């Protein structure tokens, strides 16, 4: 293999690592605009520092990382799963007593 081809392959591999799956947004990430959350989610700006999520997840499901939480009959959102408070980002708590799956939320769920 020529050294030029080797350089191209190494460069392509590094670019894939830098801009590939390791940099994709996950449920619960902070955001400012919808594009911060990739193509499967949107930025819920009512949450502190934004929150990447999917609305109506009972119908369409959540991305690989996330749990679907029903807040009432008409509202369900993909939320960041947790076990303890330190699993959540700053300013968020792990809600453990609202539905079957603990999740990170800015305030205790009603």
Give a label for each model feature.
Residues 22-110:
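Secreted, cysteine-rich disulfide-bonded mini-domains of extracellular proteins
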Residues 1-21:
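Sec-dependent bacterial lipoprotein signal peptides
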């Amino acid at each position: 293999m020529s050294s030029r081809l080797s350089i191209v392959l190494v460069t392509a591999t590094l670019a894939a690592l830098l801009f590939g799956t390791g940099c994709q947004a996950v449920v619960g990430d902070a955001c400012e605009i919808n594009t911060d959350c990739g193509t499967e989610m949107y930025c819920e700006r009512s949450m502190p520092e934004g929150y990447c999520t999917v609305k109506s997840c009972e119908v369409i499901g959540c991305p690989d990382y996330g749990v679907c939480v029903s807040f009432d009959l008409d509202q369900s959102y993909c939320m960041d799963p947790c076990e303890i408070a330190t699993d959540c980002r700053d300013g968020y708590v792990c809600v453990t007593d609202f539905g079957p799956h603990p999740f990170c939320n800015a305030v205790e769920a009603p």
